[in-house]
Amino acid sequence: MARTTSQLYDAVPIQSSVVLCSCPSPSMVRSQTEPSSSPGIPSGVSRQGSTMDGTTAEARPSTNPLQQHPAQLPPQPRKKRPEDFKFGKILGEGSFSTVVLARELATSREYAIKILEKRHIIKENKVPYVTRERDVMSRLDHPFFVKLYFTFQDDEKLYFGLSYAKNGELLKYIRKIGSFDETCTRFYTAEIVSALEYLHGKGIIHRDLKPENILLNEDMHIQITDFGTAKVLSPDSKQARANSFVGTAQYVSPELLTEKSACKSSDLWALGCIIYQLVAGLPPFRAGNEYLIFQKIIKLEYDFPEKFFPKARDLVEKLLVLDATKRLGCEEMEGYGPLKAHPFFESITWENLHQQTPPKLTAYLPAMSEDDEDCYGNYDNLLSQFGCMQVSSSSSSHSLSAVDASLPQRSGSNIEQYIHDLDTNSFELDLQFSEDEKRLLLEKQAGGNPWHQFVENNLILKMGPVDKRKGLFARRRQLLLTEGPHLYYVDPVNKVLKGEIPWSQELRPEAKNFKTFFVHTPNRTYYLMDPSGNAHKWCRKIQEVWRQQYQSSPDAAVQ
């Protein structure tokens, strides 16, 4: 039988001791001394208790003298309504909720408003999830957590007014720059440790800590979110049973897999996974499916790549311990004092982390072989250069602001004159061919080039093997620059198309040294190494194709 709107309010009650105010003031809770009403009370009957709006329902007449003189009571704030806000872009979408940026018309304050469909919540049995998230967030008052300012509702939806973390998910930056340098890794790990110390001190286990659930505010400090699977421990309990799987495969603790229980130490396991990912660019436990990931977790089967920071490695090894009572930071190991005293945090001042200026996000790109050079890239600088196609010059970079020299005009229809073979598996084309010559080149490619099958019948303009890096890991790929334009990369051993670097007007190549070059895109920087030492030729050809695609003439100035 379908529930009424009022029954849904009762199905998602605020705890009897705390009711959320419906205004974004510094203090977000107020006392509620009367017990909540029974779910069985019909919607038309007056009752005293708390509602999803964060206000109390009208009580029946009382002999209490304060209630006989309403003028002596403080005025109740008006309930917020959807029309009080101007809703903007979607910030995120979940299985039963959507988070939208909204500006309150009366104050011009921005919030991330989480909108939940009542019907869908009931149908999918997600009422406990919603209740848990709201109740946990109402207990938190710390700068490293997303803040719940207010709740309200209409006939069809629930609305949670949350603090707006303008810089989005931490995962976005890991994907963008690959690996954090040691300074960035240390600072953001320290903020997560500080947040967990507070959370566990409140008797709360997050149970789904991962980079997607760690947001960054306008000042680039962390704000942890998503408490739908969190657990509030009773005073005499140290762990929580899980009747079903909670968490995300790559970060789930072994005790949840083997004992179906989670404890505060389970969050410390996730912390170890996150530190590893900040440095290496990928989580420690990776496989083709969740079952294989779980097998690796319960066997503690993972490896550190070369050039992993030694002190960070020692910290990860002390967190990724199968016995939950042996993890650094857990109660059995004397709590957070020894964790914060680890040598990796030697330079951290813990008292005022949220007031410190976060370090600039800087990529860590150690040399992969003895004859390579280390590369460091400042993420803010990369962002500021997206509007400019010109490749920056530096002491270790080749200036590629223009094509080196105009190629001579060709005559006749001998298409071989356009092809420059670099070795048996690499070549590039001059781009001065006619449409008829292009057709002949494409026929030649289709008939004899083994990589033609991967390029959707586009003419290959340059190709060759590269080492494609993701964090501290590198994979050999065949890079194929084609008309379109497209940049495909193929697994040369298994002959499988692995992906494509997305083209846009913001795409920008950058040579760092003879072997290493970057391809910057708005959402990610691709780190590539040409083993033949011709990184500058890749950048020159990519830029030449960019000019043909986005500029009216090849000689137009770079904007």
From Swiss-Prot:
The keyword ATP-binding applies. The modification Phosphoserine is found at residues 25, 244, 396-397, 399, 401, 413, 504, 532. Homodimerization regulates its activity by maintaining the kinase in an autoinhibitory conformation. NPRL2 down-regulates its activity by interfering with tyrosine phosphorylation at the Tyr-9, Tyr-376 and Tyr-379 residues. The 14-3-3 protein YWHAQ acts as a negative regulator by association with the residues surrounding the Ser-244 residue. STRAP positively regulates its activity by enhancing its autophosphorylation and by stimulating its dissociation from YWHAQ. SMAD2, SMAD3, SMAD4 and SMAD7 also positively regulate its activity by stimulating its dissociation from YWHAQ. Residues 35-46 have a biased composition (Low complexity). Transmembrane segments: none annotated. GO terms for molecular function: 3-phosphoinositide-dependent protein kinase activity; ATP binding; insulin receptor binding; phospholipase activator activity; phospholipase binding; protein kinase binding; protein serine kinase activity; protein serine/threonine kinase activity. Its EC number is 2.7.11.1. It is a peripheral membrane protein. Residues 116-160 are annotated as: PIF-pocket. One of its GO terms (biological process) is insulin-like growth factor receptor signaling pathway. Residues 462-553 form the PH domain. The active site is at residue 208. One of its GO terms (cellular component) is postsynaptic density. The PH domain plays a pivotal role in the localization and nuclear import of PDPK1 and is also essential for its homodimerization. The PIF-pocket is a small lobe in the catalytic domain required by the enzyme for the binding to the hydrophobic motif of its substrates. It is an allosteric regulatory site that can accommodate small compounds acting as allosteric inhibitors. Serine/threonine kinase which acts as a master kinase, phosphorylating and activating a subgroup of the AGC family of protein kinases. Its targets include: protein kinase B (PKB/AKT1, PKB/AKT2, PKB/AKT3), p70 ribosomal protein S6 kinase (RPS6KB1), p90 ribosomal protein S6 kinase (RPS6KA1, RPS6KA2 and RPS6KA3), cyclic AMP-dependent protein kinase (PRKACA), protein kinase C (PRKCD and PRKCZ), serum and glucocorticoid-inducible kinase (SGK1, SGK2 and SGK3), p21-activated kinase-1 (PAK1), TSSK3, protein kinase PKN (PKN1 and PKN2). Homodimer in its autoinhibited state. Active as monomer. Interacts with NPRL2, PPARG, PAK1, PTK2B, GRB14, PKN1 (via C-terminus), STRAP and IKKB. The Tyr-9 phosphorylated form interacts with SRC, RASA1 and CRK (via their SH2 domains). Interacts with SGK3 in a phosphorylation-dependent manner. The tyrosine-phosphorylated form interacts with PTPN6. The Ser-244 phosphorylated form interacts with YWHAH and YWHAQ. Binds INSR in response to insulin. Interacts (via PH domain) with SMAD3, SMAD4 and SMAD7. This is 3-phosphoinositide-dependent protein kinase 1. It comes from Rattus norvegicus (Rat).
